């Protein structure tokens, strides 16, 4: 019988580019959300309570946008909260479909170098939400990029998870190495379970259902993790009310204890039990990529563009190598347009389009 001592609660905004608003508006909103989350993290900075506010940055692209526009003082504040463990930066560029090949997936992880080297962020976790699967090349790439744990919060609307979730396991990569992985509940589930909303619903309705589910699948760990966004939904801001709700729940002495956490804290709780976890190998099956079929012509263009960008890389490298004299403008201009082109390629292969038609 499952006995859960601690429920790890991870709060983030779900980045869904173009779903609730046009793309430029989504990017602007997420910059505002990061600033708001920073303020809330600072408000709890001196608290050692398990309910103290913590924020997880779901994707790197929106953080890069924020860093580009933030003031030096705002960046210093963010760095301080990240260093204190009140904010965690995770490693995925966006919520990506399995349309990306190995080379393109590697491109999406390039921002980690900038975020680590230029800003000093510790990035050891990665997460994807909504999407149903990822290609088998991903665990090797994440391990090479210094990622120690990967979580998936799958949307089962027209989709499904390949394993009985929630499930913690080792995802064995083609190289034979393994990456800690968690196939968890949908990313909105914390709020739906009543966290931040109704202690009565959580205690009398949802938590008994969770425990029944854990018993049914023989879940063996004393910890489990649930994610939650703002009650607004996708592309929503930080939600301050989680703090008081979790503190009140923990003060009641009822089980389970809830810890407002970031992915790094979750994985720290899992690692002592790593030896007992199962090992799975292969693709993380995708049930849900409607976009391929709904826009086959555009998908073909994007694939062709990927090949052209690789040719451009080859020509650019040759031009730089054979130039009669060093030309800093050549390298600078190439890098500028290269980044923009690859970002646009990634955005096409980003999730959620062509569904429900």
Predicted regions and their residues:
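Catalytic-domain carbohydrate-binding cleft regions of carbohydrate-active enzymes
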Residues: 1-357
